[in-house]
Amino acid sequence: MLAAARLRVTAFCGLAIVALAYGTTAISASEPAYQVITRKNVMVPMRDGVRLATDIYLPAQGSDVAPGRFPVVLTRTPYGKDGSLGDAKYYVPRGYVVIAQDTRGRGRSDGTWHWMTDDRQDGCDAIEWIAGQPWCDGKLGMLGCSYVGATQHLAAMGRAPHLVTIVPADPSINHGLGGIIYGGAFRLRVWNWVINNVAKGSAESRDPAVKEVLQQQADNRRHYLMNLPLRRGLTPLRVAPEYEDMLLKMMEHRRNDEFWRFNNIIQYADEHKDIPVFLIGGWYDLFSRSTTETYAALKKAIHGPVHLVMGPWIHGMQGRSHGDVDFGPEAAVDIRPIRAAWYERWLKGRSDGFGTEVPFRTPVRMFVMGSGDGHKTPDGKLYHGGYWRDAADYPLPEARPTKYYLHAGGALSPSVPAEKQSSTTFEFDPKNPVPTVGGCVCCARQIMADGARNQWGGEHTFTWPAPIPLSARNDVIVFTTPPLEHDTEIVGPISVQLWACSSAVDTDFTAKLIDVYPPSKDFPAGFDLIMGDGVLRGRYRESDKSEKMMTPGQVYPFRITLDPCCNRFKKGHRIRVDISSSNFPRFDVNPNSGEPMHDYRRMITAVNTIYHDREHASQIVLPLLPAGR
């Protein structure tokens, strides 16, 4: 089979390890010593006979495969295996075989695509096939981001015998616990992913005429988005039935139950193979909550070392700036040498100096945002800054959950409300939802802006193009502290306990945490920096596994989980919490009608009331670090 594959020899010598703006020490790895032989489109059989297209990059000496056996770094991707050439250029000269495989039904692979449900079995089959090849020394690691990070965890959940370590970056996992379904709401970036990727890499898109139709659908995604719900057989997506079927099933299924179990790592961490795991994430990544909670779950479930690095990053990017904000030079990290050091330790057995250098001298390394002075950078961004903190664990044991209470008139303070009765009422019109402006979203810039953003409308949001603050909307209820008297560092998970009622049998409540900069010469209107947000659909207020409609007018508690935060709120800044009932298109809009999820025909304006009195003390719980820690 290998002999039949197309052979190519390329020289990738002279690569140098880049010093990192990440700590005080560069990380060592093997020096480049090999050229590369490429074997394209090797068709690797799975246990059911389906063959998956696989590119193999082998260490070479001259025009021949180098003698001996080598550890393997494997990528399994739905995005096209050609994208792994950069990793091959880096790792193969250093004595690794790099393998890139199109997942089932994607790229050049045979079979029918399903959203990750085949990847436990296929990952195990691919790994065991590789382990039996004469150039493999029996040790395999994996790498990749997002969906490609998920295929690593799924292979580990399948307990592939020769899988030695994984390095998932921003892994797309825990779909019933925030990855796709967030508090009962649907993350529309998945809808966008399907609409976009069915036109790129699906089996159907190999037909040029069909590809054109699917691309036209993607080009008009905003119009389709404004006319949800998507109905079976009534859009061009019907020409790719496996994509249409999977998307509709996901959008209809909001309960965190057996349907989502296939990639639920948090609640089934005991199924994960006990191997070294190195997790890489970002505070503005859409999977920030999932990544940090997966770290905590694996630390309890397995004995192998588990390490976590969290930067100020968006999905798949480890740069110093994104959105409207610059985090400073230390935020920019070259991940490849860091991964290389990990592979040297766990695939090659080198232990010299490992654990004495960043980021592996402690289990957790995280970037604390917010040490900057807020000036405007030459490219027009706010300089928020930040610095790296090493920690023995996450969440930080020294972080103290501290309640800040919502008060009448928009105040936010640690004092419990004194009023016997106090509330704020607003109307939520699902035809005019609050727009998404940044935050933990990704991969959908055609419909929403991602990352660290000032909470104003503008051209970056097609549903709110006017350059005015979101706080000017009548359906955004704002609660703000006085200017802080000292720096306040918040690190860890965040939640809002809201007491509320509605005129509808079902509605949403959203919460958003904001670092409010005071007006300055560079930013005369100030700057409202989103730190994270969350949502809870009313029918899932008691359980994420079952629905229970609301009784109109009855007061209920709603516990909203927000994205985690790692930020220093500086002296003179304010901590702000925005409460509303929509965040579109990060989440699908609740029609308030109580109809089945993603099968509604009516939209009803809901009258929603938030309570903030002595008996119904709505609050945000912030993990505060003691001063000087």
Residue ranges and their predicted role:
Residues 215-234, 324-629:
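C-terminal, loop-rich substrate-recognition/catalytic regions characterized by aromatic stacking residues
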Residues 59-131, 179-182, 187-188, 319-327, ...:
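Cap/lid segment of the alpha/beta-hydrolase catalytic domain
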Residues 93, 157-271, 354:
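Accessory cap/linker subdomain of secreted extracellular hydrolases
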Residues 149-160, 498:
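Short glycine-enriched nucleophile-adjacent loop
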Residues 134-147:
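Alpha/beta-hydrolase fold nucleophile elbow
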Residues 29-68, 480-486, 499-500, 546, ...:
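N-terminal cap/lid segment of alpha/beta-hydrolase-fold proteins
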